[in-house]
Amino acid sequence: MRKILSFLVFSLACLCSSAQTEHNFTVAKYLDLFNTIYRQLDLFYVDSLEADKVIRSGIEAMTEELDPYTVFYPEEDMGELKMMTTGKYGGIGSIIRMRKDSTVIIHEPYPNMPAAEVGLQVGDVLLKIDDKDLKGMSTSEVSELLRGEPGTTFVLRVQRPNEKKTRDFKVTRRSIKKTAVPYIGMIGDAGYISLTEFTEGCAKEVRKSVISLKEKGAKSIILDLRSNGGGLLNEAVDLVNLFVPKNQKIVETKGKHIAAQYTYTTNNEPLDLDIPLAILVDNSTASASEIVSGALQDLDRAIVVGTETYGKGLVQSSRQLPYNGSLKLTTAKYYIPSGRCIQKIDYQQLRKDAEVYRKTGKRPEKKDSLKTIFHTAGGREVTEGSGIKPDVAVKHDSISPTLFYPIAISNEASIRELLEKSNLLFYLYNDDALIDWGTKYFQSHPTLPAVKDFTLTDQDYADFKQIVKASDFKYDRMSEKRLEELKKTAQFEGYYEDAKEEFDALEKKFAHNLDREMDRRKDDICRLMAQEVIKRYHYQAGKVEDAIKKDEDIEAALTVLHNESEYKKILGK
């Protein structure tokens, strides 16, 4: 028997050794091929090659084959990676955007930062940085010029709307760190905290916020993680630690390399083990945000309110590369206290399916499978592989514009909710008319009331409507487009003449009238207008304060928080 076991162990070792040898040969073979192919191209291709661009595109194609989170950062892009992890960069502290005429403008300055302090305003058109003409530059190119070493100074020339002369501003770059907590406040007897990202120190910011709100009489806490795409894992663990005991396992990472195997536990005494807690989530709540919401759900410490989260259960780490570059790559999956992994998309399976489709032209059938059931600390059932499902689901009557338009919407939950109601709102938000109206309003109103007291008038709406119509505003009419496509399909298949009467009736129904469409969406348009005005006086904090005045997720959270028996029932207590 011992001889048989020894033989089996020896055979297994040989198989492993053989597999590793084959793998190493394959790696060496294709690296040699890549190197040889590039050298042949460099020598004999009809045009001269730009080595950095050609080879970098090859590297990017390789990383894109894996997942969206594995990214190569050359030396010139390391500032972007640093900003993602720390929230810090050297610059002026303002968001910029491009107008339809291809000029770049100040879009949203941050409070107490160089742009705001020197007097730059929303709508200012950027013309020159020192002697560098910005005409024809993209926003990324202008942004690169605005950033630099803290302490360096430059002269920024701008054209302010409705002024004939240009203005020059002397701006000194500073180390910019966006606050992860743009707003805290009281909603009745509940404390509200908006957390936008998990950067260095954010858990401490939340701690201070909770203490401040409790001093103001908060009997419960609402933590808003909507549109929070995540960030640093250790900050997520430290945040959960505020509400759960010391030495509690929060998340475990598992990967191929031993360095990726790690268990994260709470290291500090908690801030408050008893205060009722609600976590707001949506389909853009991802990564570290899902660790927080998922761990607090698994430990039956908080109710989760909103819509199902994104489902990113992958962990990235950075590896230093030669020539001061870096590779951010996926090294592990994370598992929250119940043992579940909430990663939604299996990228390896996607690659296999794509290969089958490439070879056969057929898409593999999706197999229905039961999701594995896990249990919270109190025995409640939860599942893996689909993000975090809320304990209190809030159904929003909306369809995301990303189904029709492959561009980013907004990273602010309140704005996303509005834009998902109508393509008219989507286009108005991205149109210059909204900024132009906001600039006109700002220039004629030196001050603004407190956010809680601010309202727009019917005349304000009429003024905006007039600016929209005068600007020759156009928006994509998807219903008309889809109807036209359906007509062509019906003609191709020979059904059009039979259904012509119905098609004609639909054409009349779908005929767009801007006046009618705007008036139908007047309340939502006024919310967009209010956000555009408020940011000029009260910055992002004011926008959040205004948005939560009418928020379905917050209303749902408050309903449960104000009902102790329902709160305990949901948590299984």
Regions found by a protein language model. Name each.
Residues 27, 43-50, 65-72, 101-104, ...:
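Short, solvent-exposed loop/turn elements at domain surfaces
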Residues 19-30, 34-51, 105-109, 113-122, ...:
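Cleft-lining beta-strand/loop regions that shape enzyme active-site pockets
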Residues 1-27:
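Bacterial Sec-dependent N-terminal signal peptides
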Residues 44-54, 70-75, 221, 251-254, ...:
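Surface-exposed patches in mature extracellular/periplasmic domains of secreted proteins
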Residues 341-342, 346-573:
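Conserved functional hotspot residues or short segments at active or partner-binding sites
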Residues 283-286, 294, 298-305, 310-388:
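Acidic, polar loop-rich interaction surfaces within structured domains
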